[in-house]
UniProtKB/Swiss-Prot annotation:
HAMAP family: NADHX_epimerase. InterPro entries: YjeF_N_dom, YjeF_N_dom_sf, YJEFN_prot_NAXE-like. Catalyzes the epimerization of the S- and R-forms of NAD(P)HX, a damaged form of NAD(P)H that is a result of enzymatic or heat-dependent hydration. This is a prerequisite for the S-specific NAD(P)H-hydrate dehydratase to allow the repair of both epimers of NAD(P)HX. This is NAD(P)H-hydrate epimerase. Belongs to the NnrE/AIBP family. Its EC number is 5.1.99.6. It catalyses: (6R)-NADHX = (6S)-NADHX; (6R)-NADPHX = (6S)-NADPHX. The keyword NADP applies. GO terms for molecular function: metal ion binding; NAD(P)HX epimerase activity; nucleotide binding. The lineage of its organism: Eukaryota, Metazoa, Ecdysozoa, Arthropoda, Hexapoda.
Length: 226
């Protein structure tokens, strides 16, 4: 069985990966994996309009990469990136989205606007470094995801969930799709949605052994269903 990681294990594993790979490499593979999982569950023919919600950390970077790949797969992504990270990596990812003519919005959509304008929300707001409660700046966005009927695909962690314990009283939305990256986190044991995929096919054998990950065989696929 695949190992589910604690928050501290996930952080330590990421630091080990950063010593072996450039963060941009890992982000590119993670974001591509997310796009592939979305395509598996929500085809562009039925869910073309995707709101990609990006947070200020690595999870947001994964979202920007995912938006770019979704546009190449025939989707119509729109990016909402309320707190951009002022580092060259993230600025480059944002510019790449501009070059792909991916539109962005500056204001958090209301529940009614989200349901009128989008067929899917990609939640790339908070990653496994998150600790409750949700920062005040992001409360309206999390509230919208709480209340919307638009299906949600969460990248690695459903935003606002405790990384180990799962849903919190102030944030208990259930995404339709959870895309765990590298290895699933303990909160994924509480996931009750329809689709759970694992992506991030980049963990060297030595790290798989160190953390006893017992990862599934991807074969030629970018993601595997859990």
């Amino acid at each position: 069985m695949v190992k589910y990681l604690s928050q501290s294990e996930a952080i330590e594993l990421d630091l080990d990966l950063f010593e072996m790979f450039h963060v941009g490499q890992l982000m590119e593979l993670a974001g591509l994996s997310c796009a592939d999982a979305v395509a598996e569950c929500f085809p562009a023919q039925t869910h073309p309009r995707v709101l990609v919600v990006c947070g200020p950390g690595n999870n947001g970077g994964d979202g920007l990469v995912c938006a770019r790949h979704l546009s190449l797969m025939g989707y119509q992504p729109t990016v909402y990136y309320p707190k951009p990270t002022l580092m060259s990596l993230y600025e480059n990812l944002t510019n790449q989205c501009h070059h792909m003519e991916i539109p962005s919005v500056k204001k958090c959509p209301s529940v009614s606007d989200a349901e009128e304008d989008y067929d899917l929300i990609l939640d790339a707001l908070f990653g496994f470094g998150f600790k409750p409660p949700v920062r005040e700046d992001f409360v309206p966005l999390v509230k919208m995801m709480q209340e919307t009927k638009v299906p949600i695909a969460s990248v690695d962690i459903p935003s606002g969930w405790d990384v180990e314990k799962g849903k919190q009283s102030e944030c208990d939305f259930e995404p339709k799709l959870l895309i765990s990256l590298t290895a699933p986190k303990l909160c994924a044991e509480h996931f009750k949605g329809e689709h759970h995929y694992l992506g991030g096919r980049f963990v060297p054998p030595a790290l798989q052994r160190k953390y006893q990950l017992n990862l599934p065989d991807y074969g030629s696929k970018l993601v595997v269903r859990l």
